[in-house]
Amino acid sequence: GQTDGAEYVPPAVPAWDRTTALAALDVTETEFQILNGNVQGYARAREIAINPLAELPAKTTFHELGHILLGHTTETAFNDTEATPRNLKEIEAESVALLCLESLGLPGAEFCRGYIQNWGGEIPERSAQKIFHAADTILKAGRVTEDRDGTEDRPDYD
């Protein structure tokens, strides 16, 4: 039956604006060009493209921004394994997505967790530092605060 007056109100999330974030991070969004339905998104240089059919567009956005902020897209060609091994790159980017989703209370975090657990490797200390820094940068870049007077009101990630 109908429940009167019991309207679902989603919990307040710290406002994060995608357009603001992309501008602040100097990242351009381009049209998605891959016809393979399994690809959710990709990043090159300072560009991201998100599949219009992506199941979790926010998760995919954070993952691709993670690749850029972690420096993956500037390590010569993206598929080159000299610098950071490809599977570790994916884990780093997925970890960035996890932190961003959890901070903003957005769906998809459980998929990130499953992905990271399936990998089963140890995340090196240096990767962990890069991951926290990248997530923090992405969250700050899109943070919409009522007052932009330069005062810091965000929690620190230790």
Region roles according to the model:
Residues 49-51, 55, 69, 81-88:
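Hydrophobic alpha-helical bundle architecture
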Residues 59-73, 93:
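Active-site recognition of the HExxH zinc-binding catalytic motif
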Residues 70-81, 140-143:
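C-terminal helix-coil-helix/basic helical segment that borders enzyme active sites and/or dimer interfaces
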Residues 1-55:
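Contiguous, non-catalytic segments that form substrate-binding/exosite surfaces or channel walls
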Residues 85, 98-157:
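Long, well-structured alpha-helical subdomains associated
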Residues 1-7, 78-82, 158:
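Intrinsically disordered, low-complexity linkers and terminal tails enriched in Pro/Gly
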Residues 78-94, 102:
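Active-site metal-coordination segments of metallo-dependent hydrolases
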